[in-house]
Structure formats: structure tokens, C-alpha cells
Amino acid sequence: MGLSFDKRHGMTVPLWNRDKISSIPDSDLATIWIMLAKVLWEKNIVGQNFNYDRDKLRRLGFSIKRIHSDTLLKAFAINPELPKGLAFLTSIYTREPYYKDEGMYEGELRDLFLGCARDSCVTLEIDEAMDADLDELGVRKFYENFLMQLPDFYLEIENNGFCVNSSKRDALIEKYIEWDERLSYEMFEIAGIEVNSNSHLQVHALLFDEWKLPRRMGVGEEELTALLNLKNGVKYPPHRAWIEKCLEQRRVRKTISTYLMAIPDYDGKMRTTCFMCLETGRTSTSQQNPPIRPLVDTVGAGKKTDMKVMGTAFQVFTKHGDIGGDVRSMYEPEPGYVFVQLDSSQAEARVVFNLATDEQALKDIDEHDYHALTASWFFGGVESDYSKKVLGYESPIRFAGKTLRHAGHLGAGARRASTELNTQARKYKIPITIHEGIAERALKIFHAKQPRIQQVFHKDVIECLKQNRQLVAPLPWGIDAERGGVRIFYERWGDDLFREALAYLPQRAVTDNTKAAGIRIKRKCPDARIILEAHDALLFAVRIEHLDEFIPLAKKEMERAINFTNCSLPRRYLKIPCDVEIGENYKDLHKFNIRVIETPEYMRTPKSITEQFMVQE
């Protein structure tokens, strides 16, 4: 364990006296462990991505009372776009030469001890050097009072995980292997040869050398979708069918290898690893890559190719389409618990309307099926023709209206909008495709119907970029800070920069609001188990008998107002409605209607003499 109480001095404390690690006597080693436990509990701890270290310390029996500072989160508060690893931070905040290649991981034990002590010293030095930048940007309170609350929140997510229904999982594996074999046979019938859909070389040779289709730079999903979108790109229907089956088979095989065959943790639960510091403010999840968990030999022969990582990424379990729903169905809460999902309703769209000062749109979104209404602008008809409430399912036209609206919010052009729509439709098996002409016409109608999005929101964001290339996000409710998260943009001037900047404020506002709500809910309901944070939604496991108490409180916290007063685009406060769903697995979630309990007669306010004699209709 590396310790440093001063940036000029550090030490490494061996925790074992076996395998030539140290020659410390057992009695002294026991005293050292007691002293370390006291230091970790009593002192303010500074670390780099300290949730990783804390997990290892917890498994050794050590407890941390308080993380005083985390240089990874501090780097995120200062510059979300720059790398946040210790090596990079050392290079820009200290004069310490690069030392990671001096045998720390490949050399002798002494080299490892020296490297560990150096890590401790430079972490402390970096933390002190960052304070000036933190104060200059005015985000110290935001960092201390909000960002530093996130490690505890995400540590619980990583520790909880899903229970896996083995019988459902086995049935899904059988279903998807049959699906994969069927697609292989159908593709062989069309092409006349066996082609591995995951081999880009084989797919490239078939499409461009054998079939002479218009050449693309690659054969990934985006390139093949663009090829299918060309008016005269794929003229022969069997060729089109083969490409679509190729894309479908890739998704099926990824589902088998990455999700259905994922390795649970030692207690049988499926867990994930959270990364809190994407440049937009959002989080991502991934497998439990080493050294978080060791690789598992799935065959037992000791071959490197048979080694597999534990866990899986949770946030990719989309509820759209059949594949996402299938994967969700095998995940369940512990016995006696049910899942409660809190989902902010059309959150990013509401933030965009507020930033565009479009009060009519904020009113209409509560009174209409807004995606169906948007679809009627583009494709004719009326809202009820495509309404999800009327039809009972999502119409392909409604899906197109929703996707094109999101493209319009973020200033996308016709090509990007059509490619995104066709890619998503194919992924979720929604029977609709459009070409650039339809997308261009739809975007023109959209901006004519809602001109304030371009004239106010887009214009004001670009003006902020012209001033200092900096945007300040709104502030979640209950955070003691002057301003929200700050991002400095380094992309070169142009459409890519504008697209990133337009997406930042809505995404950061929504994700910070969700995280802050989750922290408040956990503080008030410590027995509820947080399973997942997914940008605009939270998933909890709650005891069945506590549902009536938990849901009204959680819904209230999710609907707290977001503060836009010190945002780069100052606006009024905004409340985002929250939909509540419950279920016994992650797929079959249904709406939960909060019961309204009338006030008992003895608690009601007594009527006046006049009210008692008035006629009640």
C-alpha cells in the first residue's frame, strides 16, 4: 500500500510476508495492519480513481471513512475533454519524469514498491496543483458538494448487480444459437459461399470485389447502412437482403458472446464497472476487466483464448427491439424485492425547449403525444394516427418522427439524420427506411414549426463558443454551488464542434439531475438498493412492503426543479415529470399508479358556520 503525507515523501507498506514480499515478523505485520486501518479510517484520503482502490481495500477488511479528494474527478471538473489518467495528469501538473516504464510492472519487487510510493507522492502533488484551476473556473463547490458524492453512489451500483435467472438464460442461449445458424444458412443460399459476417476482410471481398458494389471505406455498421441508403447503391434485392442479414447476425453473435455468455461474479450476481467521467457528463459501464476481477478460464485447458472477463455493460440493455428485451428478461431482483424504475419523461427535449425559451412547446409536450404530433408534421395525418396511447404500440412513423426531432434539436443535417434513423430502425427491427430527401424535407418542416430552437438555442450556444469556447451547465436541485459543470471545447471550429456543444447542455443537465436525485433518494431511503443509473433513469430494488412509502418520495426527488439561472444560457427553473414502473424482472416493467389516500374525517379542517349551511352540489 502506497502512502504519502507530503508531496516530497512517500512510502510503500508491504501487506504480506510470504513469497519474498517482505521479512516482517507476523506480530509486527499484525500491528502494521492495525495502524493502517486506523490511518485509513481517521485521515482524509486523496486518491486517483479511488473507487478502484477502495474495492480492493474493502476485500482486505479496511474501511474508508471519507474520500477527501479524487484527482480523476477533479480533472473531470476542470477539463472534461482531456485525459484523466495519472500519467497524463503527472505530465501537466508536475515536473516528475515519466516513471511507469521503469520496471514498475515488469521489473523486480523493489521497482514495484518505488513506483507505488511515487504514485502516492504525485497524486498528492497533482491534487494541490489542481486547486488553482478549480478556483479559476468557479467549480470548487460543485466539485466538493456534488462530484465527490458520486464515488459512494457508484460503488453501491458496482457492488449490487443483478440476479440471473439461469433457466431463462439457457433458453435464450438456445434461441440465439438457432437464430445465428438460420442466418448463416440463409446468407449461404444467397451468396453461394460461406462468409464470416464478423470478418471484415471476407465481407469486403464479397461486396466490393465479387459483387462490385460501390466501395466504402469499411464494412462496419455505419458504412453498410450508408451503402444501403444510396439510391443506386445496392440494386439487386438478394444483395440487399444479404447485407441486412449480415448486420443482423453481427448483433445476434454479439448478444451471445457479450451478454448471454457473460460470466457472473463469484456469488452468482452479474455486475458491472462504472466510469463517471465521460466528456458530456454521462457515465458508461463495462465488463469487470482485470485487475478489477481476474479472467476466468471457461474451458479449463489454460489457453489464453479461453480466458473470459467477468461481468457485462449494463447501460446497453435497451428496452427497444427484441434483443434488448430478451437480455433484460433474465435479470431479476433478490427474493422479496421488486424493481422500481424512475424515468424522466422526454427529459432532453424539455431541456432543449427551455433553452430555446419555447413555452408553447413545454406546454404541448404535457398535453400531446409529442413524437406522434411531430410525425404528423412530416408524414401527414393527425396525432391520433400515430399515437402510442391510441394504438397501444409504437408506430414506425412515430419512431421516425421521434428520431428526426432529436436530430433537429442537435442541428444534424439530412445525411446524418437519415443514417441514424435507418441504423436505429434496422437495429430494433422497425419496418421503416428513409432517404436523405425525406430527412431534409422533415428537418425544414421541423425548424419552420419550431423556429426558436435554431434562432435562440443554437444561436446562443454558438455565441458562447465564440466568446471563450466554454459552456456552463445547469445546476441540479439541492447542490450548494454557484454553477454547474463547465466544459471547455477543443474541437476545431465547424459542424463537429457545434454538434458537440449543442448536445452538451441537454445531456449534462439531465444526467446531473438524475445523479443528484439518486443521491438524495439513497440518503432518505438507505434500505433501497440502487442497481443502475442510465442517464435519465434510475433502477432500484425495493422491498415489496416498502413500495407505497418509497415511490412517492422517489418520484418527488426526480421531479425537483433544475436551476438554469447561472447556466451559459440563463433560463427559468425547469421541472421534468417522472414516470414510475415496477416489475419482477428488468424486461416486464409496468406503470405504477400512486394511490391517492383521502384525509381521514378526524384530520380534516373543520368547516365554518357558513360552510356548514351551504348546499353541497
Where are these regions (language model features)?
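C-terminal structured "cap/appendage" subdomains that terminate the fold
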Residues: 524-579
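A short acidic-Thr-Gly-centered motif at the start of a beta-strand
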Residues: 35-39, 322-338, 523-524
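Short, contiguous acidic/charged loop-to-helix segments that flank catalytic cores in large enzymes
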Residues: 20-23, 259-265, 275-278, 295-298, ...
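Conserved catalytic core of nucleic-acid polymerases
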Residues: 152-159, 214, 235, 270-275, ...
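Short active-site loop/helix that positions an aromatic residue
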Residues: 51-62, 75-78, 132, 204-211, ...
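Short glycine-rich phosphate-binding loop at a beta-alpha junction
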Residues: 43-53, 194-197, 343, 416, ...
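Conserved RNase H-like, two-metal-ion catalytic cores of nucleic-acid enzymes
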Residues: 1-88, 92, 300-302, 319, ...
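Conserved "right-hand" nucleotidyltransferase catalytic core of DNA-directed polymerases
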Residues: 1-19, 81, 92-93, 98-101, ...
